């Protein structure tokens, strides 16, 4: 097996549905309190078991603490567990290469067992197992799939010995671990995007006056040119079914949105005219496309309804300022965007009909929002200066922000699907 994760999943959900329901957090309410959680590890027999158990515990604690739904109590004593949800972890060596992790999720207030599972895994896969356990805990307590085994891709940028800017496509685990560089920095690269199946990343490269759409295979690290264009290609975005790419194409003074069928390699022009139309993003059901355009004279957001014969764009942004880089929520309920007003940049969200606009973050130059697969958080670029660009997360409910650590400057992020 790939991960050699033999999930001997002894799922013990002994609590009836009526009891389980009260344990779920209503994540749409802003005044809800976090779940108090303790992660406790049992005594280990060997040094290897003890070291790995400690590492796994820390990753689980960090994952659940960072998602903003749990109040993780670190190093809490048993006598303080009176009203907490407790995760108890035990680790034992099965052979020289394999270990078995067992964990138990329980409610100390009612003294009820919520979940018990065991996982056999290779020692080198301990971090993946930590994320897997975090996902299972999140799913059981929140009633929603966790995102701890997902990845982030972005543009990593730094200066070489000649102070020349070097850009690379980077990919890492959602917690910032296991960073890999997919390109060597010899060519200009931009806007990496995960394929819906998670097997590849598409990005744009510019060479000798042409724009190339390149697909990097994440399994074997090979890459292939999907298509080459005269002019400038930008803002690629997969259709939710992964069968097409939607891109912005600038040529002969016009900038329009094209769809590219990945099987036939045929293109179709979606927008036409002298207006600058860019940043396409499809709704999860693929019936609508949101994009940014200056059709009205200033940069605004528009929707095209693919179910109608007339594909006339409908404007949905009417606030002060300019709107850019829209991206549809994976749940389909919101559209994230960048707003520029009076020299300030904002990351915001609105309903697909343009109503209920909310601004979540403000900065000197913040842009390029991308959704987490749970549809509750947004990652974006925060460029405080040309030499200081980082990735930040903001949640929709409390507007809490935190920086995502990267060893170099980082921009243009994208988050993988579940």
UniProtKB/Swiss-Prot annotation:
InterPro entries: 6-blade_b-propeller_TolB-like, PD40, Tol-Pal_TolB. Residues 1-21 form the signal peptide. GO terms for biological process: cell division; protein import. Keywords: Cell cycle, Cell division, Periplasm, Signal. GO terms for cellular component: periplasmic space. Part of the Tol-Pal system, which plays a role in outer membrane invagination during cell division and is important for maintaining outer membrane integrity. Belongs to the TolB family. This is Tol-Pal system protein TolB. The lineage of its organism: Bacteria, Pseudomonadati, Pseudomonadota, Alphaproteobacteria, Rickettsiales. The gene is tolB.
């Amino acid at each position: 097996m790939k991960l050699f994760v033999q999930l001997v999943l002894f799922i013990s959900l002994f609590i009836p549905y009526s009891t389980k329901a009260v344990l779920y957090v209503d994540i749409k309410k802003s005044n809800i309190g976090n779940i108090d959680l303790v992660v406790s590890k049992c005594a280990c027999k060997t040094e290897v078991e003890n070291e790995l158990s400690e590492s796994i515990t820390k990753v689980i604690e960090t994952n659940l603490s960072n998602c903003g739904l749990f109040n993780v109590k670190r190093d809490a004593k048993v006598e303080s567990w009176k009203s907490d949800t407790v995760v108890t972890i035990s680790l034992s060596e099965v052979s020289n290469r394999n270990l078995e992790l067992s964990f138990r999720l329980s409610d100390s207030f009612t003294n009820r067992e919520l979940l018990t599972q065991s996982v056999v895994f290779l020692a080198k896969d301990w971090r993946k197992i930590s994320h897997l356990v975090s996902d299972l805990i999140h799913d059981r307590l929140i009633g929603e799939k966790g995102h701890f085994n997902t990845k982030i891709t972005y543009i990593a940028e730094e200066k070489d010995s000649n102070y020349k800017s070097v850009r690379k496509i980077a990919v890492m685990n959602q917690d910032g671990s296991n960073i890999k560089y997919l390109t060597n920095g010899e060519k200009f690269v931009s806007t990496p995007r995960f394929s819906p199946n998670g097997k590849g990343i598409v990005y744009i490269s510019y060479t000798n006056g042409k724009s190339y759409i390149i697909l990097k295979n994440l399994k074997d690290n090979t890459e292939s040119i999907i298509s080459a264009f005269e002019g400038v290609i930008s803002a690629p975005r997969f259709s939710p079914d992964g069968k097409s790419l939607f891109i912005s194409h600038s040529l002969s003074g016009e900038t329009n949105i094209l769809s590219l069928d990945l099987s036939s390699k045929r293109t179709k022009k979606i927008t036409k005219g002298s207006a600058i139309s860019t940043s396409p993003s499809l709704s999860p059901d693929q019936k609508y496309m949101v994009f940014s355009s200056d059709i009205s004279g200033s940069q605004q957001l528009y929707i095209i309804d693919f179910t109608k014969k007339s594909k006339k764009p409908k404007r949905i942004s009417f606030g002060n300022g300019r709107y850019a880089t829209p991206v549809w929520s994976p749940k389909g309920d919101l559209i994230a965007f960048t707003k520029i007003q009076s020299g300030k940049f904002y990351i915001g969200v609105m309903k697909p009909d343009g109503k209920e606009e909310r601004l979540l973050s403000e900065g000197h130059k913040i842009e390029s929002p991308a959704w987490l697969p749970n549809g509750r958080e947004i990652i974006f670029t925060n460029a405080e200066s040309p030499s200081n660009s980082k990735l930040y997360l903001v949640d929709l409910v409390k507007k809490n922000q935190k920086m995502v650590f990267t060893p170099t400057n980082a921009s243009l992020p994208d988050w993988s699907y579940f």
